């Protein structure tokens, strides 16, 4: 069946391009705002001393806050998926494409959330943490746009959007998954190291 734009592109692809692409842009702005208070509020309210002296490890503190962010984003993405899946009552959907888009968006936001947690641990001012997170996330998302074509292939390996784009096209490469996992792990470990240094120095 041909004729309308959605039918030509495929209903699932048409919706994914509209919904998930828009969601990725919105969450690029929202995630820094959500994560900027995770640690900075602890500094400002002077509860960090009590938190670090509690009978839990720094790793548990950071992972708890980070997993809370992941669960929040997972809930938002799940809501989007449910809304799209409701259309399966009337149209045929490509569930594989839907799942790869959802996974790609979750991995993208997981990386930005880890970055936000790290910058939140650097300052007691939430606005500064949010700004640094947004600036850094935007740089990693758009980094491939800033370089000439002869270096673009190399630079694209560091672009979050380049890796996310494969998921958006329904392609799930192990390299893309590993990139996002290493990206998030790096910033989580840096946050733990930051708190460890602070605890040692008092």
Predicted regions and their residues:
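Secretory targeting signals
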Residues: 1, 7-9, 13-26, 64-126
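Hydrophobic/aromatic residues in alpha-helical transmembrane segments
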Residues: 31-35, 83, 114-115, 191
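Helix-loop-helix units of permease transmembrane domains in multi-pass membrane transporters
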Residues: 38-68
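Hydrophobic alpha-helical transmembrane segments of multi-pass membrane transport/permease proteins
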Residues: 1-2, 22-30, 132-139
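Terminal transmembrane helical anchor/hairpin motif
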Residues: 1-14, 135-202
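Long, hydrophobic alpha-helical segments
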Residues: 18-41
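Transmembrane helix-loop junction
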Residues: 41, 85-89, 121, 145, ...
């Amino acid at each position: 069946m041909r004729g309308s734009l959605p039918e030509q592109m495929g209903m699932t692809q048409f919706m994914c391009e509209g919904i998930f692409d828009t969601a990725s842009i919105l969450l690029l702005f929202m995630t820094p705002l959500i994560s900027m208070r995770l640690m900075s509020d602890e500094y400002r309210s002077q509860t960090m001393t009590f938190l670090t002296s509690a009978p839990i490890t720094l790793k548990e503190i950071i992972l708890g806050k980070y997993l809370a962010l992941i669960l929040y984003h997972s809930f938002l993405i799940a809501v989007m998926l449910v809304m799209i899946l409701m259309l399966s009552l009337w149209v045929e959907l490509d569930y594989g494409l839907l799942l790869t888009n959802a996974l790609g968006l979750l991995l993208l936001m997981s990386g930005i959330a880890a970055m936000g947690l790290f910058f939140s641990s650097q300052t007691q001012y939430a606005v500064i943490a949010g700004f640094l997170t947004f600036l850094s996330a935007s740089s990693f998302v758009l980094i491939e746009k800033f370089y000439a074509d002869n270096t673009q292939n190399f630079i694209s390996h560091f672009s979050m959007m380049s890796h996310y784009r494969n998921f958006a096209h329904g392609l799930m490469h192990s390299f893309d998954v590993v990139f996002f996992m290493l990206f998030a792990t790096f910033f989580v470990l840096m946050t733990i190291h930051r708190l460890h240094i602070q605890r040692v120095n008092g």
